[in-house]
């Protein structure tokens, strides 16, 4: 399991701790990942995802998992999230046709 957000693609970043004497030591900045269960209204199902706290706020801001995924760029999403996005878009198209 990698330290990357499944929805936004946020990963580990590297930098320095800088002391008062300007000594620099390498460190890692880890994303604030949470195991969250999100509900898809279109699919009538809940999905467990490992996403950053920032992604949780973004999902709520866009009005839920379905809206977030339909507007999200595929290159930021994990493979699992891309598959879910394709299923949601397909199901929305079926509902619109019916």
UniProtKB/Swiss-Prot annotation:
It comes from the Bacteria. Pfam families: Ribosomal_L28. GO terms for biological process: translation. Keywords: Ribonucleoprotein, Ribosomal protein. GO terms for cellular component: cytosolic large ribosomal subunit. One of its GO terms (molecular function) is structural constituent of ribosome. Gene3D superfamilies: Ribosomal protein L28/L24. Belongs to the bacterial ribosomal protein bL28 family. This is Large ribosomal subunit protein bL28. It comes from Bartonella bacilliformis (strain ATCC 35685 / KC583 / Herrer 020/F12,63). The lineage of its organism: Bacteria, Pseudomonadati, Pseudomonadota, Alphaproteobacteria, Hyphomicrobiales. The gene is rpmB.
């Amino acid at each position: 399991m990698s330290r990357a957000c499944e929805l936004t693609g946020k990963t580990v970043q590297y930098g320095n701790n800088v002391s008062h004497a300007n000594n620099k030591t390498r460190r890692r900045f880890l994303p604030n990942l949470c195991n969250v269960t999100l509900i898809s209204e279109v699919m009538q199902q809940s999905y467990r995802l490992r996403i950053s706290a920032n992604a949780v706020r973004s999902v709520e801001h866009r009005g839920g998992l379905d809206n977030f995924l339909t507007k999200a760029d595929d290159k930021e999403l994990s493979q699992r999230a891309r598959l879910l996005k394709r299923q949601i878009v397909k199901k929305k198209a079926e509902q619109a046709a019916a």
